[in-house]
Design a protein with these regions (language model features):
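Asp-based, Mg2+/Mn2+-dependent phosphohydrolase catalytic module
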Residues: 2-25, 44-55, 164, 179-288
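Alpha-helical elements of Rossmann-like donor-binding domains used by nucleotide-donor carbohydrate transfer enzymes
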Residues: 16, 75-79, 96, 124-128, ...
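Hydrophobic alpha-helical core bundles mediating ligand binding, dimerization, or RNAP-core interactions
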Residues: 73, 77, 81, 97-101, ...
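Active-site neighborhood of HAD-like aspartate-dependent phosphohydrolases
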Residues: 45-99
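Signal peptide processing junction and immediate N-terminal pro/mature segment
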Residues: 33-43
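A metal-dependent, Asp-based hydrolase signature
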Residues: 85, 94-144
């Protein structure tokens, strides 16, 4: 059996990371919240007041929106390399692993491969990458453990604190292509205070298929307009908006490490209902 020393180390580091992140967000807010900022915040809350009464639940994209998949996968690769003496470009490996996500998903949609959950898709991509990066000598158990690195992703520093605030007023749930086991394990690992776990797996489709958004809305509210899709990606939000869900863009400029353009506030202007710089900002704009 593989020992969970890496997970224990990561869990400890993750707790320190979250605590430091929440503290820094809190201190920064306290130190810079001038009267002008207070006025702007009050104005923002006022503009969104209509949403506060109508929205009952917020559902969240997870990869990139709630958690830093890139930094987490790089670190997991570095731990594996250190343990096994593997010298690899783990930054490139992480980008390639995520980069294979949409093309492999499309093979399911086109019928080239049978329906497969995200753990299965990640494993298909991983098998190819191990060959491409000439990484050898791993047992089946070690490969499976590495594939579950996606269960052990770190949250963005503002995520836990912001979710806790939102939870005080709204139902908060995942709505991710990640499978239920992955999202549940990640939630426990990262300390994410979800009220429930909703996954595309439950509907036999991947986002942005309509069945995912409408399925979640049916479970959480009498109408789609009572559910707010929250994501860092405009394609996700546009798909939800077309089906009547409310939408919130939370910008994550560092999702791709600055190597690829992330969606910005300007992309969402006049399209989404709420634009926030992070989850603490979103909580404030949603009246919590």
């Amino acid at each position: 059996m593989i020992q969970d020393n890496d997970q224990a180390d990561l869990s400890s580091g993750r707790r320190d990371f979250i605590a430091a992140g929440v503290a820094s967000v809190t201190l920064a807010a306290a130190g810079t919240f001038s009267s002008a900022a207070a006025s702007a915040a009050d104005s923002s809350v006022s503009r969104n007041a209509g949403l506060h009464g109508s929205v009952k639940a917020l559902v969240f994209d997870v990869f990139g929106t709630v958690v830093d998949w890139r930094g987490s996968i790089i670190r997991e690769g570095e731990l594996l390399g250190k343990r096994k003496g593997i010298n690899a470009d783990w930054v490139a490996f992480a980008d390639a692993w995520r980069g294979g996500y949409q093309p492999t998903m499309q093979k399911v949609r086109s019928g080239q491969i049978a329906w497969t959950n995200i753990d299965g898709l990640h494993r298909i991509i991983l098998n190819d990458l191990l060959r491409q990066f000439n990484i050898n000598g791993l047992s089946e158990e070690e490969i499976d453990h590495f594939n579950r690195a996606w269960h052990r992703l770190w949250p963005w520093p503002d995520a836990v604190g912001g979710l806790q605030r939102l939870k005080s007023r709204y139902i908060i749930s995942t709505l991710s292509n990640g499978n239920v086991a992955l999202l549940t394990n990640m939630g426990k690992y990262a300390g994410l205070p979800w009220d429930c776990i909703l996954s595309a797996e439950l509907f036999g489709h991947y986002k942005p298929d309509p069945e995912v958004y409408l399925g979640a809305a049916k479970l959480l509210g009498p109408s789609p307009s009572q559910v707010m899709m929250t994501a860092a990606h405009m394609d996700d939000l546009m798909a939800a908006k077309k089906l009547g869900l409310r939408t919130a863009l939370v910008t994550r400029p560092l999702e791709f490490g600055g190597k690829r353009r992330a969606d910005t506030a300007e992309d969402g202007e006049g399209i989404v209902d709420v634009i926030a710089s992070d989850f603490m900002d979103l909580a404030a704009k949603m009246g919590t």
